[in-house]
Curated annotation (Swiss-Prot):
InterPro entries: Flagellar_assembly_factor_FliW, Flagellar_assmbl_FliW_dom_sf. Acts as an anti-CsrA protein, binds CsrA and prevents it from repressing translation of its target genes, one of which is flagellin. Binds to flagellin and participates in the assembly of the flagellum. This is Flagellar assembly factor FliW. It comes from Halalkalibacterium halodurans (strain ATCC BAA-125 / DSM 18197 / FERM 7344 / JCM 9153 / C-125) (Bacillus halodurans). One of its GO terms (cellular component) is cytoplasm. GO terms for biological process: bacterial-type flagellum assembly; regulation of translation. Belongs to the FliW family. It is found in: Cytoplasm.
Length: 151
């Protein structure tokens, strides 16, 4: 067990097998190499991706398919190798939220999903270069806003 201080839940004991290694960090947070996935609030679709090193670094994330069933992510071979993915059922995809006031104006980044190999506890933020998905998609808008034409 590892004791960590969290932004939203205070001090927690976390099993070692729940720690997720981000070997390259997350863009703009390259020194942050270890996170834990926590429910944000019981009974909601929101999670916290909490740094185990920095208390105030906690991203609010969601499963984008819960909000946008037509959303698609094709993992590049390099990501499959980097995260040691051998079974697609081991892959979890999440998207970062930008929480706004009022909450109904919150946006989700569909252009750079968080990809986690749940079996190996390895993750990365994948920047989709060849996509029409927006990085500021309104979360509660049913239709996807396409930022640009896909190449």
């Amino acid at each position: 067990m590892k004791v960590i201080e969290t932004k939203y839940n205070g001090k927690l004991e976390v099993a070692e097998d729940r720690l997720i290694a981000f070997d390259q960090g997350i863009p703009a947070f390259e020194d942050e190499k270890e996170f834990v996935l926590l429910p944000f609030e019981e009974g909601t679709p929101y999670y916290t991706l909490q740094s185990t090193k920095t208390v105030d670094l906690a991203f609010i994330i969601v499963n984008p398919f819960s909000f946008f069933p037509e959303y698609r992510v094709k993992l590049p071979e390099a990501t499959i190798v980097q995260l040691n993915i051998t079974n697609e059922n081991d892959v979890a995809i999440f998207s970062l939220l930008t929480v706004k006031e009022p909450f109904s104006e919150t946006t989700v980044n569909l252009q750079a999903p968080i990809v986690i190999n749940a079996n190996k506890q390895m993750g990365k933020q994948l920047v989709l270069g060849d996509t029409a998905y927006d990085r500021k998609q309104p979360l509660f808008q049913k239709e996807l806003v396409l930022a640009k034409e896909a190449k």
